[in-house]
Amino acid sequence: YEKDDPKTVYYMSMEFLLGRALGNNLINMTAYKEVKEALEEMGIDLNVIEDQEPDPALGNGGLGRLAACFLDSLATLGYASYGCGIRYRYGMFKQKIRDGYQVEAPDNWLKDGNPFELRRPEYAKEVRFGGNIRVEYDETGKTHFVQENYESVMAIPYDYPIVGSVSYTHLTL
């Protein structure tokens, strides 16, 4: 669809409850059975490999699942589209009840890396937090806003493929 220069959908969400990628991608590419059989011939159990993959801790609950389903549908239908969200290094968080109180802890889902994502440092952007805004005017009278005394981080994007079901298309989260 790139050569036709279509309109593009950018689906933005604070969370995407994706689920595990390996099995889902193999199913969507109609390759699950073949890969499972090929691995079995080598004495490898695909289910054991699948169990090693943590859930991407990019969301929880119904809205995160809905966002992931929208991406899956867009990829399956072949729409030119992207998912845009936050890659939480330590996940949203894990919740436990201890001694009658809710306790939150980080979800270190990236401790062993993520083979399904591609780091894109060439597109890194500075993101500024806090500080104050000073207004300046240039010689033509045009207003310019200058942010001062801020904290900044470098936001590095990661591409994460969302494979469409039996469609030979994918989109990027």
Task: Write out the residue ranges for each language-model feature.
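Conserved small/polar residues in nucleotide/adenosyl-binding loops
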Residues: T169-L173
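Conserved oxyanion/phosphate-binding beta-strand-loop segments in alpha/beta enzyme cores
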Residues: Y1-E50
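Conserved phosphate/anionic-ligand binding catalytic regions in large, soluble enzymes, centered on
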Residues: G62-D72
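Short linear interaction motifs
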Residues: I49-P56, R65, S152-P157
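Flexible loop/turn segments at secondary-structure boundaries
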Residues: L18-R20, R65, Y88-I97
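Conserved alpha/beta enzyme-core scaffolds, especially Rossmann-like or related mixed alpha/beta domains
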Residues: Y11, I44-N60, Y79-I86
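Extended, Lys/Arg-enriched charged tracts that mediate electrostatic binding to polyanionic substrates
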Residues: G91-Y168
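Glycine-rich phosphate/pyrophosphate-binding loops
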Residues: F70-D72, T76-K94
